[in-house]
């Protein structure tokens, strides 16, 4: 009875066995290319169930598809090929590719994957550690660093742009200085630490602690599986102004008065040291049929109610775009109730003009930012100033224009694709 009880206590739970991770295979020294005749050490670190402690712990080693005879946790090898290891009850480890060279010069790169923000170290090594002179490092055929003698090339914070094919060249004294020699090219890939974030509007059931009438935005991203424990911080912006600086929370509540300008928001994700920073695109409002679409829900969302036609304040509307372009635009007298001018061609924050309108845009109309209003006022001021200049420089011409019954022409520049004007009430 007692031996059976002991066995039951040593057996891992089914949940623990189901979550066994693959062992970690490491290389010492950490270079994937060595000279012929050299040896390196491979070490396999993995989880071993307690039940197996009753027997000698066994580690399986593979060279390609060949099972090696050793069952130790570490082995010394000098044969080129692809190595893997496996512990009982766990999957096979990730591979390590070992290369053996007979050249005078080799370029050594680390075996472990290099992620964004981490240092990338390259080592140009002469035959059995002979000193290399006039050392050059190349990235995709372009020289990136020069050293007088043997030295490592280090990129302190690697980026995706640092991926590519590397090579080194130099001379050695054997016994006199040789002609420049080149190593074989080695491919290096900098892994993405996390994806570029995407800003989205959270539904009523997803939002937590949202202020009444506000809208909760979430900055979503995904870490690499091998770096899923890396902490990230998030910041939120409205146009170029930070509405919340970097913090650990991935959510931000937009106050109710600012709900109408949701498309002017974007976010940024970064590591705690800011070694890797990535920004999101502008917020894209939900399309038709989505859970956040006001027309597809029985209870309207707070931001949908705030954007209803009867609740939104007055705003300038962008005139429709036409293919025909008029040459000039008429301007009324200053004594009239308004002044006509061409619409601004400045870009606005939000989706492109060619994107199909969403139900929210059809019901609430185009949301114009303060920047567009400022540009329109500047154009109005430009028109008034042009009339003042005309009166100062050409008084006679102005009197002749005033004496004619026809409406004077405008001195405004017409932006392409603006067939009509928008009156602004004075």
From Swiss-Prot:
Q: Where is the Ig-like C2-type domain?
A: 23-101, 103-189
Q: Name one GO cellular component term.
A: endoplasmic reticulum
- MF terms (GO), sorted A to Z: transmembrane signaling receptor activity
Which InterPro entries does this entry report, sorted A to Z? Ig-like_dom, Ig-like_dom_sf, Ig-like_fold, Ig_Fc_receptor, Ig_sub
Please list where the region (Disordered) is annotated: 400-426
Task: State if Cytoplasm is listed as a keyword.
Answer: yes
Disulfide bridge positions per record:
44-85, 124-168
Compartments, record wording: Cytoplasm; Endoplasmic reticulum
User: Could you tell me in which tissues this protein is expressed?
Assistant: Expressed at low levels. Expressed in B-lymphocytes. Detected in tonsil, lung, kidney, spleen and placenta. Expressed by a small subset of germinal center B-cells in tonsils and by melanocytes (at protein level).
> Where does the secretion signal sit in this chain?
1-17
Keywords, A to Z, come to: Cytoplasm, Disulfide bond, Endoplasmic reticulum, Glycoprotein, Immunoglobulin domain, Repeat, Signal
Concerning Pfam families, the annotation shows: Ig_2
Report the superkingdom from the record: Eukaryota
Gene Ontology biological process terms in this record: cell surface receptor signaling pathway; immunoglobulin mediated immune response; negative regulation of immune response
Q: Which PANTHER family match?
A: FC RECEPTOR-LIKE B (PTHR11481:SF94), IMMUNOGLOBULIN FC RECEPTOR (PTHR11481)
Please give the name of this protein: Fc receptor-like B
Species name: Homo sapiens (Human)
């Amino acid at each position: 009875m007692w031996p059976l009880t002991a066995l039951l206590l040593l057996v891992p739970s089914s949940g623990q066995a189901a979550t066994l991770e693959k062992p970690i295979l490491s290389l010492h020294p950490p270079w994937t290319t060595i000279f012929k005749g050299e040896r390196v050490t491979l070490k396999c670190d993995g989880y071993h169930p307690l039940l197996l402690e009753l027997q000698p712990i066994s580690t399986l080693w593979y060279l390609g598809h060949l099972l090696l005879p050793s069952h130790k946790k570490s082995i010394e090898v000098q044969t080129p090929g692809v190595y893997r290891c496996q512990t009982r009850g766990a999957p096979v480890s990730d591979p390590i590719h070992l290369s053996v060279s007979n050249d005078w010069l080799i370029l050594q790169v680390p075996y472990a994957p290099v992620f964004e923000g981490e240092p990338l170290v390259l080592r140009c090594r002469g035959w059995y550690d002979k000193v290399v002179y006039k050392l050059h490092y190349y990235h995709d055929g372009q020289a990136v660093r020069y050293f007088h003698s043997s030295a490592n090339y280090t990129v302190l914070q690697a980026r995706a742009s640092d991926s590519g094919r590397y090579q080194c060249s130099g001379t050695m004294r054997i016994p006199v200085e040789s002609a420049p020699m080149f190593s074989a090219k080695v491919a290096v890939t900098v892994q993405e630490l996390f994806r570029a974030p995407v800003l989205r509007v959270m539904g009523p059931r997803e939002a937590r602690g949202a202020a009444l009438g506000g809208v909760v935005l979430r900055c979503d991203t995904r870490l690499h599986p091998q770096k899923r424990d890396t902490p990230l911080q998030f910041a939120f912006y409205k146009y170029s102004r930070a509405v919340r600086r970097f913090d650990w929370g991935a959510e931000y509540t937009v106050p109710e008065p600012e709900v109408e300008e949701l498309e002017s928001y974007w976010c940024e994700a970064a590591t705690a040291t800011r070694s890797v920073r990535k920004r999101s695109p502008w917020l894209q409002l939900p399309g038709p049929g989505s859970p956040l679409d006001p027309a597809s829900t029985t209870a309207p969302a707070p931001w949908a109610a705030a954007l209803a036609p009867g609740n939104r304040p007055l705003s300038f509307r962008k005139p429709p775009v036409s293919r025909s372009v008029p040459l000039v635009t008429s301007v009324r007298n200053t004594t009239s109730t308004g002044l006509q001018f061409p619409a601004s061609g400045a870009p606005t924050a939000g989706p492109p003009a060619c994107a199909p309108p969403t139900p929210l845009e059809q019901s609430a109309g185009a949301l114009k930012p303060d920047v567009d209003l400022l540009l329109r006022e500047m154009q109005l001021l430009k028109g008034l100033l042009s009339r003042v200049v005309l009166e100062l420089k050409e008084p006679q011409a102005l009197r002749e224009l005033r004496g004619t019954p026809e409406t004077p022409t405008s001195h405004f520049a017409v932006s392409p694709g603006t067939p009509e004007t928008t009156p602004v009430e004075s």
